[in-house]
Amino acid sequence: MTAPNILILGIGNLLWADEGFGVRCVELLNERYRFPDGVRLMDGGTQGIYLVQHVQQADCLIVFDAVDYGLAPGTLKIVRDDEVPRFMGAKRMSLHQTGFQDVLALAAFSGAYPRELLLIGVQPEELEDFGGSLREPVRAQLEPALRVALEFLAERGVVAAARDGDAERLAPAPLALGRYEAGRPAEELAYRHGDIRFIPQQPLEDD
């Protein structure tokens, strides 16, 4: 019997506080564990529709994400199979979620759709802090979220082995959690609402 292709996907935007939850989960799994052939970890970031081909190739899809369930900040909620698309479209707070809902729809339309879906989502606390990191209620759910994924895999005979060396990075080194937070500017120096280079400025008045 051929082993299933399993895709473990983290989606979100590291630059917008709790939006980075999904990517941080996959980052930690990659740092700590080695997985058997057929299991792939991917930082999906905000790629949206460009993830279709990866979803089509998966027999089993595990997604980590920050999702507005309308619950208390930091609440971890697990959704499976046919319910997943509904929650990926609930009270959308970022462009990538719209894109990923479309990813699932296109994969289903093509006939190449995962047999199993698992969404491990956390209710965010803050999304409007550009350059910010995870808030404490959300950060506290990283370990529980990893346990859910590892238990789900173990139930299917997929065992993660502890790494004994450095892993190949899924994202550029400066975005690793420790370096990212260490390089965060002080509050009085930072602009937390976006990249000022791309925000329209009021024209200067002539003297």
UniProtKB/Swiss-Prot annotation:
The keyword Transmembrane helix does not apply. Coiled coil: none annotated. One of its GO terms (biological process) is protein processing. One of its GO terms (molecular function) is enzyme activator activity. InterPro entries: Pept_A31_hyd_express, Pept_HybD-like_dom_sf, Peptidase_A31. It comes from the Bacteria. Ni(2+) binds at residues 19, 65, 96. Signal peptide: none annotated. CDD domains: H2MP_MemB-H2up. Keywords: Aspartyl protease, Hydrolase, Metal-binding, Nickel, Protease. PANTHER family: HYDROGENASE 1 MATURATION PROTEASE, HYDROGENASE 2 MATURATION PROTEASE. Not known. Could be involved in the processing of hydrogenase. Belongs to the peptidase A31 family. This is Hydrogenase expression/formation protein HoxM.
